[in-house]
Amino acid sequence: MKIEPIWPNGARLALSIVVDVEEGAEMSVADGDSRAEAVDEMGMMVKPGIRNFSNESNYAYGIKAGAPRIMDILTRRNLTATFTAAAQSLERAPDIARRITDDGHETCAHGYRWQVQHNMDEDAEREFIRRAAQSIEQTTGTRPVGWLSRYLFTANTRRLLIEEGYRYHMDDYSDDKPFWDTNTETGQPMLILPYAIDTNDMKMWNAPAYTPKDWADYLNDTLDVLYEEGAEVPRMMSLGLHLRIAGRPGRAAALESFLDRVNSTDGIWVATRAQIMEHWTKRFPPSNL
């Protein structure tokens, strides 16, 4: 069934800029974990119990230099984003937490720490989800309404999110537009706002890695296709960023180039995920399904 474009002001495409804030919440021997964080730009794997000081400093760069650079880029273009934050990161970087709120961005929960939850029992996962929301509300002044896991989650996750008052879930890669999960255990529909790996700046970290120019070209091609399709059906594009990745100068230049193209193109609605959630819920309420 053809669905006419439905974004505000007749926009053909909704662009969701997502900024992951994970630095300071990653695995760390210094924080009592058995091993150092495995996600490392240099690809170094160290034995359990050994600190990876180099990787720790790379994550610290995200907080010290990457965060202000990315936030300045957004501010100069009057753009808002969804900051998917591991709560502990914001506890350790209160200035960033305050600026997220002051600049009009949204904070989405990305766990309490940046850790997988697939191996948690139900009680532990519930506490993990609840603690993240409580902490983010304390540091930013606003309780998160969305959730993004670190890769793996459980069969209980979506039900627990509903029970804890979350209103959208990002752990899905199956579409280019929002949709309702009406088959939840609670019987209460959950709005799914799909994310995307292919446009994520992690593509400049993982081998074989994109150059910043490769990444910008891919973003532009993605925008072209979704923008054209958006004349007929609703389309949403996700742009995933990390403080320690896109926050580096050469990569930030590619980001700026793409965002300048976005700002110069009519018919693109740059919105937080909470804004997309509210708009979709009003336009396509689950009661009409």
Regions found by a protein language model. Name each.
Residues 1-191, 216-239, 245-289:
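Catalytic alpha-helical scaffold of carbohydrate-active enzymes acting on polysaccharides/glycoconjugates
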Residues 177-178, 192-214:
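Positively charged, amphipathic and often flexible ligand-engagement surfaces
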